[in-house]
């Protein structure tokens, strides 16, 4: 994952010892993991869940604190009906987000699981799929 973030010139703090992390108030953990490792990773951990955004990368977040919950709170705060909201996603960590809005749009390169819950599918992210979708819908 360090190499992944280095691509965008982002610096990443890497904890060498998990005991050091437990001393801090942690809101999210990003780590490399495969689906077959999830159960072992969360063994003994209370109130957390894994959302995968790549087949080798996951976020560990508090239960009910994912993108969907965030969208719902924002819609409520600003008084926006979910039918008036849309979201784009490409990974399994976007499933709850797409379910929380009136129009959930999966990218062409999205996971099959995300496409299954999407209302629509637009072009690939590498081919400016969001831009072309917005052009087609006369949003821009």
Regions found by a protein language model. Name each.
Residues 1-88, 92-97:
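Conserved acidic, metal-coordinating active-site core of Asp-based
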Residues 136-140:
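Generic C-terminal helix-cap and adjacent flexible tail
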Residues 60-64, 115-121, 131-134:
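Short, charged, surface-exposed secondary-structure boundary motifs
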Residues 70-73, 129, 133:
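Well-ordered alpha-helical segments embedded in enzymatic catalytic cores
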Residues 55-58, 109-112, 126-130:
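Short, acidic/turn-prone active-site loops that include or flank metal/cofactor-
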Residues 71, 81-118, 123-125:
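Acidic, Mg2+-coordinating phosphoryl-transfer loop and its flanking beta/alpha structural elements
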């Amino acid at each position: 994952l360090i190499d992944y973030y280095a691509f965008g010139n982002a610096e990443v703090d890497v904890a060498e010892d998990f005991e050091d992390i437990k001393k801090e108030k942690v809101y999210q953990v990003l780590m490399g993991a495969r689906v077959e490792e999830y159960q072992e990773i969360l063994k003994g951990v209370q109130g957390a869940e894994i959302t995968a955004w790549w087949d080798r990368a996951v976020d560990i977040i508090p239960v009910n604190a994912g993108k969907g919950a965030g969208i719902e709170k924002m819609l409520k705060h600003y008084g926006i009906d979910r039918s008036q909201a849309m979201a784009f996603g490409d990974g399994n960590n976007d499933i709850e987000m797409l379910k929380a809005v009136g129009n959930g749009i999966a990218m062409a390169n999205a996971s099959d699981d995300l496409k299954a819950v999407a209302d629509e599918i637009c072009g690939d992210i590498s081919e400016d799929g969001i831009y072309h979708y917005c052009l087609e819908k006369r949003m821009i």
